[in-house]
Amino acid sequence: MAFAKLSAFVLALGATVALGESPTHRCLNKRVTCATGQTTANEACCALFPILDDIQTNLFDGAQCGEEVHESLRLTFHDAIAFSPALTNAGQFGGGGADGSMIIFSDTEPNFHANLGIDEIVEAQKPFIARHNISAADFIQFAGAIGVSNCAGAPRLNFFLGRPDATQIPPDGLVPEPFDDVTKILSRMGDAGFSTVEVVWLLASHTIAAADHVDPSIPGTPFDSTPSTFDSQFFLETMLQGTAFPGTPGNQGEVESPLAGEMRLQSDFLLARDSRSACEWQSMVNNMPKIQNRFTQVMKKLSLLGHNQADLIDCSDVIPVPKTLTKAATFPAGKSQADVEIVCNAAATPFPALASDPGPVTAVPPVPPS
């Protein structure tokens, strides 16, 4: 396990506990001061702080919420979701969940169709794993949690240390595709242990996301108008009537979007309008406390696929605290309530009253490369 790999390094670290506390108080509030000066609840987590600094400086361009953050978050999902208890119960290998297989078997798994383009972040992360004594399985989830923390408005995600690396390649076909219908997506996600509402919660990740390969003529095309902030614009803008493609038409898994420069995945469009998921989708619009809470819950669940939490070490306090975001959701300039395609009319989840941004019609710029 990664904990075993790190243990020798951890034992070499200086650690102190505050003196003058009662035994009971110390048991409840024990903090360890690492050799690097930071404090944490568990000595084993001290080894993560140098890795954190390296990631922020050399992978995320000085703690930015940019392309490499988007891709690292995508990798957390693609690595973990290749997990099928149904296959396991049928006597086949169903994948190891969050086991680093995408990096361990980087000559094979990134070539699966659903993983198109993920080889770039895989290759970017490999040198960090090579120079730090951490498993690929842990690094993928650690980098994803750190990356999310760079985005204003995001929740502080959990991180658990100690995942062993994969020993087998998961079967192809376990990662949902943007051209899959809702029934297929919900079935696949259900096999992995996620309910319909949890699928919607996971898609909060698309508020800080962009596509390079759905339409290769326009790399870096974001899924909402604010790809560097973790907000509810994605859920709002996916409910707006599509009017045009940001690049070329006819790409598999893409439908018309409401804004120039914004991409809309077919799967997002369908989930926002399907009777099984539309009300939960609508409930996320302008509801940041809910988005933050639910995304934290579901990302924890994703990161533990294939593992028992009791076997891992909680190092969540190593993850930086994201900046807060106070701006409410608004219609992009040129859009209003008249552009919303409402499917859910449940009294419990009414569509909120929102203002429209002033100025000319919104055009969304691409996410610049790292």
Curated annotation (Swiss-Prot):
Residues annotated as binding Ca(2+) 1: D79, G97, D99, S101
Subcellular location, principal: secreted
Catalytic residues in the record: H78 (proton acceptor), W201 (tryptophan radical intermediate)
Binding site for Mn(2+): E67, E71, D212
Cystine connections: C34-C46, C45-C315, C65-C151, C279-C344
Annotated glycan sites: N133
PROSITE patterns recorded: PEROXIDASE_1, PEROXIDASE_2, PEROXIDASE_4
Propeptide, chain numbering: 21-31
Catalytic activity: 1-(4-hydroxy-3-methoxyphenyl)-2-(2-methoxyphenoxy)propane-1,3-diol + H2O2 = guaiacol + vanillin + glycolaldehyde + H2O; 2 Mn(2+) + H2O2 + 2 H(+) = 2 Mn(3+) + 2 H2O
GO MF annotations in UniProt: heme binding; manganese peroxidase activity; metal ion binding; reactive-black-5:hydrogen-peroxide oxidoreductase activity
CC annotations in GO: extracellular region
UniProt keywords, alphabetically: Calcium, Disulfide bond, Glycoprotein, Heme, Hydrogen peroxide, Iron, Lignin degradation, Manganese, Metal-binding, Organic radical, Oxidoreductase, Peroxidase, Secreted, Signal, Zymogen
Residues annotated for Ca(2+) 2 binding in this entry: T207, D224, T226, T229, D231
pH dependence, entry free text: Optimum pH is 5 for manganese oxidation reaction, and around 3 for all the manganese-independent reactions.
Binding site for heme b: H206, A210, A211, D212, H213, V214
Family label: Belongs to the peroxidase family. Ligninase subfamily.
Protein name as annotated: Versatile peroxidase VPS1
Organism of provenance: Pleurotus eryngii (Boletus of the steppes)
Gene name of the record: vps1
